[in-house]
Amino acid sequence: MVPLVQTQPLVKFLFLPLLLTTFVRAQSSSTPTTPLLSPQAAYDQAMHPLEITRSAISNWSDAELKALAIAVKQASEACGARTPEQFTGDDLIAYTRLCALGQQWPIVIIAANRYINSTDPAKPQLAQAYAFQINATEHTNDPKAILAGSLAMLKAVTYTSLTDETLYGALHYLQLAFTPEALTLYAARQPILLAALRTTQPPSPPGRAGESPVPIHTLYANGLAFAALQQFSGDPAAAAKTVAELETALPATLSPDDSIPIDETRRQYALLGTHLPVIPLTVSLFSVNETPHINTNYGDSTAFFLFPEWCAQCIRLTRQIMPTLYRINGGDGDEVHLYALLAQPPPPVDAPPKTPPKPASTKSRSVTNEPTLPEPPKTAAEQLRGTPTLIVPLATLTQFAATDFPLLIAIDPHGIIRFIQPASENTLNPGDFLDQIIMHITKQWPRQKPAAAVSPSASPNPIH
């Protein structure tokens, strides 16, 4: 028999890995870990750049645009060959959808109203009818009808993802050009959002296509959008009350799929009313050898368009900044500055030119007959040379909690951030999103101009 004293070192050796493993686990359990999104939420996040790109029809291929034009034409003809009075129930909604594809907006409104006002005891597609009606009134530019339809929808149907998407479009339409109407709609929706946040029961199962429960983080972001518009309207006290009510209504425990986007929404909202933070600038694309800078004489207003290098529609929008600057600063006394902030790694330093190879003889070229290689596609920075674009670090996207692009950041004459919101590709059109934001800022927070001020339009450079 082996003496016991000889087995003790072996026992200690065998138990040592177990002890070390226990120690490491104890250390790991005491160290807070960074919360991670669920696999589905991580997948959705990874797909978001593709969704942003595909959502802009201007990014579609010629073949897709031709197919869309054919579909719209056929739907328009099919819509005109029928009348709303021919249909009821689900067939009436199908007809409304057909006419919406054909962009026959007056008929869409008539058909949707026919379904809404019908005496049928069951209207399973009532939310769809309201969605078609409100969307059509946006296309016919009828703000009173948009507000009335949205308020009616809130009272008539459950607040699902379809209702949420419909009201998002209505509020986006109303928020700047018809701010009182937008505030009325926000105020009517807010109790519904707060009640949904306070509900502890599991969400109801999805209903019809497009009608799923609204996630907690979306409810919170929508509620905070109300506070943002209250701030933009010059009522910070009301905004603070709105935020306090939202925070009180939030559940005590949140999953990472909700807590992570809610934290991002909070960070972005917290920027409103604060001075523009320092933004590290890498390169200016406006002119060669120009030192990158942001004019701290903010004029009547300064706006930035922040986006990553993969955003194709953002690049197209940026190429329209110079004509927009000349239009806005064209003699009415306004002084507005616009910049694009291209978030990407710093451009590499150009390598010294190599000694060119000796040209091949005419005889060898004719024998090989090598095809000319196509030029590589231009980078975002190459496409934006000569525009008021500043290259900034990728961390700038995190700094402004930017998830949709381009993110428009507008500041007042004192450098205070007043507006943060994703912008569409038609934002720079005359009278559109940017013009409305600047008009509101110059009215709400006017710049104190010297009596003998020289008109900025006399300057040959509208940027600096």
List each language-model region with its residue ranges.
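Short active-site neighborhood of thiol/selenol oxidoreductases, capturing the structured segment around
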Residues: 290-321, 338-341
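Short solvent-exposed coil/turn linkers within tandem alpha-helical repeat scaffolds
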Residues: 78-91, 102, 116-128, 156-167, ...
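Alpha-helical repeat scaffolds
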Residues: 68-79, 106-117, 143-157, 182-201, ...
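A short beta-strand-turn-helix
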Residues: 280-302, 326-330
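N-proximal helix/coil linker or "cap" segments that precede and/or mark the start of modular domains
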Residues: 229-284, 295-298, 368-371, 449-456, ...
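N-terminal leader/linker segments that initiate helical-solenoid repeat arrays
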Residues: 26-90
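Structural microenvironment flanking redox-active thiols in thiol-disulfide oxidoreductases
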Residues: 315-382, 391-397
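Thiol/disulfide oxidoreductase modules built on the thioredoxin-like
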Residues: 382-386, 391-437
